[in-house]
Amino acid sequence: MSSTRMPALFLGHGSPMNVLEDNLYTRSWQKLGMTLPRPQAIVVVSAHWFTRGTGVTAMETPPTIHDFGGFPQALYDTHYPAPGSPALAQRLVKLLAPVPVTLDKEDWGFDHGSWGVLIKMYPDADIPMVQLSIDSSKPAAWHFEMGRKLAALRDEGIMLVASGNVVHNLRTVKWHGDSSPYPWAMSFNEYVKANLTWQGPVEQHPLVNYLDHEGGALSNPTPEHYLPLLYVLGAWDGQEPITIPVDGIEMGSLSMLSVQIG
């Protein structure tokens, strides 16, 4: 057991271009890497590994996945060679039981939702990492409960990093001109922040029932970028501080909100 409890982070990752850029959000990720206790290992949950069933990367050297198209060549030339941890993958299999977890040794790696933020936090890529997939067949409350199980790792020197965007509607993105947030995007983003510290039965949690908000479905036409937040909220002990390292809405409907537990 580690003497220092590791924080749990939800990071709004946004565009892959953040890898190449220096902006408010990337600087906040850099600051987290410089100021938080250094983890022995990282478990990352990314919106970009959305599967039927649960998988975890279990290879020694996971590949860098460039899961995007139409970006500058410099982005495809960027790699994040962080080591994997088959031992940590096996630990997750036991910790998450009876949920069946598949050990992935060849199909996935670190996608841009994970390495795109961690390359700013830990640019030396020298911390062992595994990536856990998001089961597309499960309801929101189930993902919150997965976070509760993962919380135990925080006392073992392992940091939980979840990566997504709480408002993620690419169909309404303002690619050019006025990039001011849509009112519904602002409303939902504020709703998320207002309910981060809510306590009560999981099934009644406002952020588990996020689609009940009038802007919930428009902010998240699909759930994969929202669900990573629930893993982090599930890992909260109900007493630790919850802070917001950075916030903002880009291109009208892309929230860059980040949340820190502990």
Task: Give names to the regions the model predicted.
Residues 75-83, 105, 133-140, 216:
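Flexible, glycine/proline-enriched loop segments at strand-loop-helix junctions
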